[in-house]
Amino acid sequence: MDDLPTHLDFLLSEESNPKGRGDTCRYLAAGARRALWMRARGGSLGQALPGLLEALEGDEHAIIESSSIMAFLQPAVSLLVIGESERELKASARQFLARADAFVTVRPDLKPLTWPATSLQTLEGKPVFLVSPDEWSNPALCQFVRDQLTAAEVR
């Protein structure tokens, strides 16, 4: 990780600028109460997890943008976001593909067959939500997330 000081294996910081260009800035601009950024070197995410969980303590819901975190947590809802130019999934996304509840894409031609080593059986029956690059949301996606969170509260 180029942005992580060499003497650290992980670092948790809180974003405060909703007008910035990073993902955490966009979360704030979209209305998030707060946005945290956990950076961890390969293999250090498990060490970083206690600090992240402590930082999230008391929060009813949290959005965690990470496939790798799925090795440690079972989310109430898991969305796999496929960007415009992604022709191949990252290894961490492929590893937890079966645990995705739905897919979100800006590409109307989303074709899982273009993803090497991806089983179509893993994807069958899972909803795909098309969003615009300006909005990254739509009413059906919002309703899906609400329904998943409600179902998780019942369990």
Which functions belong to the PLM regions below?
Residues G51-H61, S66-L149:
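Conserved catalytic-core segment of NTP-binding enzymes
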Residues R33-G58:
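Active-site rim loops that border cofactor/substrate pockets in soluble metabolic enzymes
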Residues S16-K19, S44, H61, E88:
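Short secondary-structure boundary/capping elements
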Residues M1-A40:
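N-terminal phosphate/diphosphate-binding loop that engages ATP/GTP or pyrophosphate donors
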Residues G22, S44-Q47, W136:
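Conserved active-site and cofactor/substrate-binding residues in soluble primary-metabolism enzymes
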Residues C25, G43, S67, A71:
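Flexible, active-site-adjacent loop/turn segments at secondary-structure boundaries
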